[in-house]
């Protein structure tokens, strides 16, 4: 579920040495499954452990995860990085904003997950986003662009060279993508 590097474990162990005996850490997600999801780590004294918590035992500590946060922390990584500017704890949780779907989930769910977790974060840099409207019986993903992508002069390139290539590579059962958007150029358009 969660990988904690040796450096991060050593950092936590040093901090925990100054806490009440038996105190461990808790890893959690606030607003899981939403665009506002935030991950955190806190101290977890022995009396704060719930029966429904998952206990993840590591060499130097135990990390507790509450029942609600657990699916959103799948594939999460905690590291303690030191460089010329100093040291910092990093927590990467790729599924915090959206729960990972199973490999055997319906095609619509798997495509939607890829759009939300991989493609929309790229488009967000330009203030854009794309939504899956449907998958036709003949295997076309019907998409609708919004935000800065609406009427952007590069939308065709983004659709065919970016999104379509990624989707077809990941989902060979798709035949292609089509744009349902009625593009109206305005100040919101990126290019």
From Swiss-Prot:
It comes from the Bacteria. Binds 1 [4Fe-4S] cluster per subunit. The cluster is presumably bound at the interface of two monomers. The keyword Cell membrane does not apply. Pfam families: Fe-S_biosyn, NifU. SUPFAM superfamilies: Fe-S cluster assembly (FSCA) domain-like, HesB-like domain. InterPro entries: Fe/S_biogenesis_protein_NfuA, FeS_biogenesis, FSCA_dom_sf, HesB-like_dom_sf, NIF_FeS_clus_asmbl_NifU_C. The keyword Nucleus does not apply. GO terms for molecular function: 4 iron, 4 sulfur cluster binding; iron ion binding. [4Fe-4S] cluster binds at residues 149, 152. GO terms for biological process: iron-sulfur cluster assembly; protein maturation. Its cofactor is [4Fe-4S] cluster. PANTHER family: FE_S BIOGENESIS PROTEIN NFUA (PTHR11178:SF51), IRON-SULFUR CLUSTER SCAFFOLD PROTEIN NFU-RELATED (PTHR11178). Involved in iron-sulfur cluster biogenesis. Binds a 4Fe-4S cluster, can transfer this cluster to apoproteins, and thereby intervenes in the maturation of Fe/S proteins. Could also act as a scaffold/chaperone for damaged Fe/S proteins. Homodimer. This is Fe/S biogenesis protein NfuA.
